[in-house]
């Protein structure tokens, strides 16, 4: 079983953030890829359609820029594993190609004081014509 396709989330300040499970231990406990404090309430989640949500996000960014010429992307490796599990890797790669994404797989991203998993972080470069 791959935990990449079944993330749990924690609610912080009204927003939900993934806390990805690394593996199940022999004693029944779980090891996470990022910090989970004692007593934190975790909620089972269901991921959005990876391809559709990526396409929608890139379209929103491209529209705001007047077109995206290039995206430097940092894509959590767990998203790649999830795409493989759901047989969406090729379709997701097509979206990345359509929006000029180049970059790296990562082991999560830093957002403020939080280490996040199963996220895509990027820098989009484009330009509006005047």
Language-model region placement:
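Small-residue-enriched flexible segments
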Residues: 1-99, 106-130
């Amino acid at each position: 079983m791959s935990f990449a396709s079944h993330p749990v989330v924690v609610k912080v300040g009204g927003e939900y953030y993934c806390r990805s499970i690394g593996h199940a231990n022999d004693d029944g406990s779980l090891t996470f890829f990022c910090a989970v404090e004692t007593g934190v309430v975790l909620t089972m989640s269901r991921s959005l359609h990876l391809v559709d949500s990526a396409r929608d996000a890139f379209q929103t960014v491209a529209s705001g820029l007047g077109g995206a010429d290039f995206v430097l992307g940092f894509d959590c490796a767990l998203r790649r594993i999830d795409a493989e599990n759901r047989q969406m890797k090729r379709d997701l790669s097509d979206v990345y190609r359509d929006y000029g994404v180049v970059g790296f797989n990562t082991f999560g991203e830093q957002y403020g004081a939080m280490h996040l998993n199963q996220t895509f972080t990027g820098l989009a470069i484009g330009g509006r014509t005047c």
